Curated annotation (Swiss-Prot):
Pathway(s) per entry: Amino-acid biosynthesis; L-tryptophan biosynthesis; L-tryptophan from chorismate: step 3/5
UniProt keyword annotations, A-Z: Amino-acid biosynthesis, Aromatic amino acid biosynthesis, Isomerase, Tryptophan biosynthesis
Segments passing through the bilayer: none
Gene name as annotated: trpF
Gene Ontology biological-process annotations: L-tryptophan biosynthetic process
Protein name from the UniProt record: N-(5'-phosphoribosyl)anthranilate isomerase
First-level EC class: isomerase
Gene3D superfamilies: Aldolase class I (3.20.20.70)
Keyword presence, Phosphoprotein: no
């Protein structure tokens, strides 16, 4: 069954809304972004959440020492590397790693296997932007990889297209951020519930 990660969580209220709707994990962004979360705030949120939901930290080209400090301070369960990190970098991380790739054409599975992460995340490509664009991409590039590896699908997912994405790829996880937000920003609990309900319906 495909799981749901709600990314760009910025408050305890948003985290609880995701947990109560049935999300598998929340994503907390520690990289330059409108959804960036300060370390002390993330640590406070995660103390309240305890082990009730997985907490995944999103990083872009972060120094390994600083990443390890944030993982410990915020009690992160996993990290998502969303930048240009090389395969050797993964060996410096003490928790499971999700490695992100921005898709702009065909993908070579053997090249991707150099990283050996816990899972591969695929997002849409936009020059100079590391995720969170709200844009989707051609999922057909991922069909072979999805049959062989754990994949997480991101990039422009919403209540209108997530059912089709799951039917086409059967990813381990779907990752959503802007697709469950209010027009003014911030997570919309009703959209989170609707999104997760659609994902769960695909398993029946």
């Amino acid at each position: 069954m495909t799981r749901v990660k709600i990314c760009g969580i910025r408050s305890l209220e948003e985290a609880i809304a995701a947990r109560e709707a049935g999300a598998w994990a929340i994503g907390q962004v520690f990289a330059p972004s409108p959804r960036r979360l300060e370390v002390d705030i993330a640590a406070a949120i995660n103390r309240e959440l305890g082990q009730s939901i997985l907490k995944i930290g999103v990083f872009v080209n972060e120094e390994a020492e600083n990443l390890r400090r944030i993982v410990a301070s915020c009690r992160l369960d996993m990290v998502q590397l969303h930048g240009d990190e090389e395969p050797a970098y993964l060996e410096e991380v003490s928790v499971p790693v999700i490695k992100s790739f921005r898709v702009r054409g065909s993908l070579e599975l053997e090249q991707l296997k150099r990283w050996r992460p816990w899972a591969y995340l695929f997002d849409s490509y936009h020059p100079g932007v590391y995720g969170g664009t709200g844009e989707s991409f051609d999922w057909s590039f991922l069909q072979e990889i999805a049959r062989q590896e754990r994949i997480i699908l991101a990039g422009g997912l919403n209540t209108e297209n997530v059912g089709r994405a799951i039917h086409q790829l059967r990813p381990l996880v779907v990752d959503v951020s802007s697709g469950v937000e209010y027009p003014s920003g911030g997570k919309d609990p009703a959209k989170i519930r609707e999104f997760i309900n659609i994902v769960q319906e695909q398993a029946t």
